[in-house]
Amino acid sequence: MQGRRHRQTVIRDNLHGRNDYFFQTEMADHLREAGAAFYALDMRKYGRSLRPHQTIGYTDDLSVYDEEIGEAIEMIREERDDEPIVLMGHSTGGLIATLWAHRHPGVLGGLILNSGWLEMQSMATWRGAMAPVIGRIAARSPMWEVPSGGTGHYGRSLAGRASSELDIPEGLSAQDPSVAGWPIIQEWKRPESYPVPASWLEAIMAGHDTVEKDVHLDCPVLSMVSTSAYVEEEWCERVFTSDTVLDPVVIAQRSLGLSDLVTIARFPGKHDLVLSDAPVREAVYATMRGWLGAFIG
């Protein structure tokens, strides 16, 4: 998605998460108005790039995405010459973006993470115990489905507060997508997600291991997370103000080691912060604009 050209334009290449695709056009509009040229990428086997014969979202090697990210950046460079590139990633896309930045030093002007999946929910202790087990399973049965659990609250919350059977907080417009529901193509973003193959999870945990042991980037990082996690079965107001997928405390802790210049920002919002209530979204956009102006612009 391309924006208008401005003096000191900042280039953004946005990477979505698992069970996801780019539809956050409000975020793109806000950043274009702030002077950024915004581009988004649906990675292979996701969203607009998904083909009928493909297994949605599947890979056993996260570096495979280097190809399309690299091609996208080359295309941006052809149009935007030497303007700074800021890579942004949400959830799994945040992990992929971080690893790409690690493998390509000197390319990025900055990295923005929106609930970036930098570590398993129980930190490296759980990963260290589980990785050998998952590795053995993946070697024998790559597509074996790992039980993933989860409450399904996040997908349900995206249908909006109006259908939630909960009280709608004062001040929220009935027309706002956080109330009316986000316009989602369910073929590309499924309410209950889809199976987790063992070989895919092995690749994710290998990425987490690299982040923990090897990643130290040469660019500033903005890591945005929710103020709280909520993983209980009860359907309540907290599903709209918490991360119901990942642990934001773990993400923030892991983010601190990504670079010498790391900004942590917390918001009372959902797993994808730009799909939260309108006041939270405005705070997220303001934080990104301020950070870009301070460290990139």
Where are the language model's segments positioned?
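Short, surface-exposed "cap/lid" segments of acyl-processing enzymes
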Residues: 2-43, 50-52, 238
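Alpha/beta-hydrolase-fold enzymes
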Residues: 92, 96-195
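Catalytic nucleophile-loop/oxyanion-hole region of alpha/beta-hydrolase
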Residues: 19, 47-80, 84, 281-284
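The conserved SAM/SAH-binding core of class I Rossmann-like methyltransferase domains
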Residues: 39-41, 114, 265
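Short beta-to-alpha linker loops that shape the active-site pocket of alpha/beta-hydrolase fold enzymes
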Residues: 18, 42-47, 117, 268-270
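Serine-hydrolase catalytic core
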Residues: 148-261
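Catalytic active-site module of serine/aspartate enzymes centered on a nucleophile-bearing elbow/loop
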Residues: 261-297
